[in-house]
């Protein structure tokens, strides 16, 4: 059974529109924060990946479906898990919930690239540390 990464956020006034509803683009910020915290959970940061491996993790594509709205002062949980891995990328699913209610479902394709934006192999330490969070397939 795979593990999940969890990250909690609180909705602040700056996150909302005039009606007190989270502005749609801000969910992408929440998802990015959760991915950054997932790296931290396995003992790495984006800066370390750049310094140690000369690589950056970029978003190649993002599919997001808005199921419900979040509002000012809501407490949200972002659950993230790895769907599949290739030599140079991985696919992550992320779900934002408020209690039992799903607010957002997303599928993110992340690619490791060098400083010239060319794909590079996922560093072995990242692959190994993410392994408990894989839920579907590995294509190496």
Predicted features and spans:
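Terminal targeting signals and extreme-terminal segments of soluble enzymes
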Residues: 1-77, 85-140
């Amino acid at each position: 059974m795979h593990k999940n990464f969890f990250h909690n956020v609180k909705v602040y006034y700056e996150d909302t529109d005039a009606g007190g509803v989270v502005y749609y683009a801000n969910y992408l910020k929440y998802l990015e924060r959760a991915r950054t915290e997932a790296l931290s959970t396995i003992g790495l940061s984006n800066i370390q990946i750049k310094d140690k491996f000369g690589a950056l993790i970029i978003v190649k594509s993002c599919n997001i479906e808005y199921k419900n709205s979040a509002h000012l002062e809501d407490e949200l949980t972002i659950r993230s898990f790895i769907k599949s891995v290739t030599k140079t990328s991985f696919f992550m699913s992320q779900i934002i919930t408020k209690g039992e209610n799903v607010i957002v479902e997303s599928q993110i394709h992340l690619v490791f690239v060098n400083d010239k934006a060319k794909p590079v192999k996922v560093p072995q330490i990242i692959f190994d540390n993410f392994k408990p969070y894989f839920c579907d397939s590995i294509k190496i």
